Amino acid sequence: MSNPESAKKQVDPPGYNELFMVRDTRNVDLERGLELCKPEKVNKQNLFTNIIKPQKDKINIKTDKIKFFLNNLFTEFSKFHDSCYPDGRISTRSKLRWPLLIIWCILIVFAIDKNFEVKDFLSIWINESFINENRFYSEIWGPIAIYICLFILLLLGLICMFPLHLCRVCVLALRETGMIIAVLGAALGMIIAALGATITGLLYFSHWALYKVVILALDLKIEPFKDEIAFLTLPTHNGETLSIRDNNQS
């Protein structure tokens, strides 16, 4: 004689709950998922085409964008330097160099954000890190804080004065700890003095770089000398205007 329970199990379709006779979709979906995960069921070509290749193309686009940006930066900088400062001399008597540096830093922060979407990326990260109740405040103050941090980091990095003052403080602290450390501090002070002799050059090189990045951000092109119109009112690092036509006549 056949067992009634075994006969019932044979009659009931798979995927149905025996007690309530409702379809158990969880087991069916699990079985399908396991079936699709088998190595012979995975289409590697579709996986590469739909997932891996788009991500790789996106990374390549970002890399090419950065390379193009840097290439244009140094190309335009070379044209500007060779045309306006053929002998390499730069005036250091300008009192506007610090305001100009701050203004250029502000402009370059927006230029970097425009080209590489720094603010949007960091804003998403900040918004996801905050609790839902604080999301309104993070959307307002998040971009402001990002811009301020970018400006401070850029200003400190380009001025190159912050490491100098920090080293001087370290030297003063070392000189008070003993004779041996005082000798090391004196040696470090000599190195700092040597670096201080070149700080003006570093400062004005940062002026050049900032000026050229702003030109690139505003889509301004520096043409050769044959195009005098582009150079009629070219601003210099002294806050003046350089007239190529007057310069050629003189």
Swiss-Prot record:
| Keyword terms | Cytoplasm, Endoplasmic reticulum, Golgi apparatus, Membrane, Transmembrane, Transmembrane helix
Intracellular or extracellular location(s): Cytoplasm; Endoplasmic reticulum; Golgi apparatus; Membrane
Q: Which domain of life is it from?
A: Eukaryota
Q: Where are the transmembrane segments?
A: 98-118, 144-164, 179-199
Mention any Pfam family matching this sequence.
Answer: DUF999
Q: Which residues form a coiled coil?
A: none
What the entry lists under InterPro entries is as follows: DUF999
Give the way it sits in the membrane: Multi-pass membrane protein
Q: Name one GO cellular component term.
A: membrane
Tell me which family the UniProt entry assigns to this protein: Belongs to the UPF0494 family.
Protein's recorded name: UPF0494 membrane protein PB2B2.07c
Read off the lineage from the record: Eukaryota, Fungi, Dikarya, Ascomycota, Taphrinomycotina
